[in-house]
Amino acid sequence: MNNLLSVQDAACYLHISSSTLYRWVHCKKIEYVKIGSRVLFTKESLEIFIQNNTITPN
């Protein structure tokens, strides 16, 4: 489970608040893993999210 990040750790990794991340989970804007009641994230899915939301200049 070392490659899974908690909401708090993932939010810190993305430089956003935990509440923003929970909102994205609720809206299914970001990929996550649910184990019981825990919401977790892989670093790989966070990297993909960052790549998919990167805006490059013209």
Language-model segment annotations:
Residues 1-20:
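Polyanion-binding surface elements
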Residues 26-27, 51:
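Residue-level detection of the helix-turn-helix DNA-binding "recognition helix"
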Residues 28-29, 45:
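Conserved functional loop/turn residues at catalytic and ligand-binding sites
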Residues 33-39:
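Short Lys/Arg-enriched helix C-cap and helix-to-coil transition segments
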Residues 46-58:
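A short, Lys/Arg-enriched interface patch at domain edges and termini
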